[in-house]
Regions:
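A short glycine-/small-residue-rich loop at the edge of a beta-strand within enzyme catalytic domains
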Residues: 65, 69-72, 89-92
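C-terminal amphipathic alpha-helix
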Residues: 25-68, 104-157
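Short, solvent-exposed, charged loop/turn and helix-capping segments
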Residues: 78-102, 156-157
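Helix-turn-helix repeat elements of alpha-solenoid scaffolds
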Residues: 73-77
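Hydrophobic membrane-insertion alpha-helices, especially the h-region
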Residues: 1-16
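Alpha-helical interaction segments
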Residues: 4-7, 84, 137-138
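Hydrophobic single-pass membrane-insertion segments
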Residues: 12-26
Length: 157
């Protein structure tokens, strides 16, 4: 199911990339609430999906290489969401909420990158103590992302 969601999101994003773009093109948003809600929904799906895949890898149900492939796709999608937020040019009343959500996405992307580090450490049979340090950092990044999501929600007009 996770793979299906990731493929659907990836496919949809390619339509954006295949559309001819000029250098002065901008992403116009008129309903900032709906736009942020959509990004939040995609972010949640990606974060949940990658967490499930990460647990599968830690449990030995999937290989680190398979996990890395899924995580890189998810990270790319998070980057796409970051670009959408930046290019949306939120109105003054929505700016604080958008900036906090932007930080939540960045924390999630950092989290995904750290999970890739763990996958590579597992492939290389790294010392468990070193893996545990990175796992601790991953937990901190998850909490950081949640904190920014809460701040974004609180800052909504």
């Amino acid at each position: 199911m996770t793979i299906v969601i990731l493929v659907a999101i990836t496919t949809a994003s390619f339509f954006v990339w295949l559309t001819p773009q000029s250098y002065d093109a901008t992403f116009v948003v008129s309903d900032f609430k709906s736009h942020l809600d959509e990004i939040k929904e995609i972010h949640g799906a990606l974060a949940d999906g990658i967490e499930k895949e990460f647990q599968k890898m830690l449990n030995g149900d999937i290989t680190p290489d398979h996990y890395i492939e899924v995580a890189e796709i998810s990270s790319s999608q998070i980057n796409s969401q970051i670009i959408q937020l930046v290019e949306s040019k939120a109105s003054q009343e929505w700016q604080e909420s958008y900036l906090n959500y932007l930080e939540a996405l960045r924390a999630t992307n950092s989290n995904m990158r750290e999970t890739i580090v763990v996958a590579n450490m597992i492939k290389e049979n790294a010392d468990k103590q070193n893996v545990d340090k990175v796992l601790k950092k991953i937990d901190q990044l998850k909490e950081e992302s949640k904190s920014f999501v809460s701040a974004s929600d609180s800052a909504r007009p």
